[in-house]
Regions:
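An anion/phosphate-binding loop that grips the pyrophosphate of nucleotide cofactors and donors
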Residues: 62-63
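Short, well-ordered coil/turn residues at beta-beta hairpins
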Residues: 68-69
Length: 70
């Protein structure tokens, strides 16, 4: 299974990762980035994904990258 990074896990990024998890994608293979530690904790709890505030870290070991920023 491929590793996925979601850069910018706001509303659009959350919709994307939510769909991936609901479709059976392994949440441990998803890393999401957000500037807010509170938002990152919320995403970890809700979906079981990994989070970071470092975009470079997220893309470094990912096969697919979604850029979800304004």
């Amino acid at each position: 299974m491929r590793r996925v990074a979601v850069i910018g896990a706001g509303n659009i990024g959350e919709a994307l990762l939510s769909g991936l998890v609901k479709s059976g994608f392994d949440p441990e293979k998803i890393i999401a980035t957000n500037r807010s530690p509170e938002r990152s904790a919320e995403l970890r709890e809700r979906y079981g994904v990994r989070t970071t505030s470092d975009n470079h870290e997220a893309v470094q070991n990912s096969d697919v990258v979604f850029l979800c920023v304004k």
